[in-house]
Regions:
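Glycine-enriched alpha-helix->loop->beta-strand junction motifs that scaffold or abut catalytic
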Residues: 42-46, 91-96, 116-117
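Alpha-helix-loop-beta-strand connector modules within alpha/beta enzyme cores
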Residues: 57-83, 87-91, 115-120
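Short, acidic/polar
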Residues: 28-40, 80-88
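Conserved anion-binding
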Residues: 84, 96-124
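Short, ordered loop/turn segments at secondary-structure junctions
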Residues: 50-53, 79-80, 102-104
Length: 124
């Protein structure tokens, strides 16, 4: 029996992207996590859309569990760039975020600061 460790779903996804490979994702707007589970073997990642859909924290958590069961990263498109949108999603277990309507380097830095804990950021 070998004791090899598999890369995390996020590390595998990043490596695939860094290698220039095509990554196929599924946009999730439905609240039922069965959608994520059903698509799990056919995609490289999920992006759960909170910008254009309403979803409870419980539904979001169900999608995270389904993605984790399929060893796929779950990215969340938040409705805005502020800490109140970003922090709860990261605290709930998102593997990454997609932030819409970012138009400047200063806005990008604000988003990064919202994602990182002090002293590198302001996430609390």
């Amino acid at each position: 029996m070998t004791n090899e460790t598999q890369p995390s779903p996020v590390a595998a996804f990043r490596a695939k992207m860094a290698g220039g490979e095509i990554c196929i994702g599924a946009s999730i707007t439905l609240t039922d996590p069965h959608a994520t589970d059903a698509l799990g073997d056919s995609v490289d990642f999920f992006w759960i859309d909170l910008e254009h859909s309403m979803m409870s924290a419980e539904a979001l958590g169900g999608h995270f569990l389904a993605a984790k069961a399929r060893s796929r990263p779950a990215l969340v498109r938040v409705p805005g760039s502020g800490t109140p949108f970003i922090k709860p999603v990261l605290d709930a277990g998102a593997d990454g975020i997609i932030v819409p309507q970012v138009r400047s380097a200063a806005e990008v830095q604000d988003v990064v600061n919202s994602c990182r804990y002090p002293p590198l950021g302001e996430r609390g």
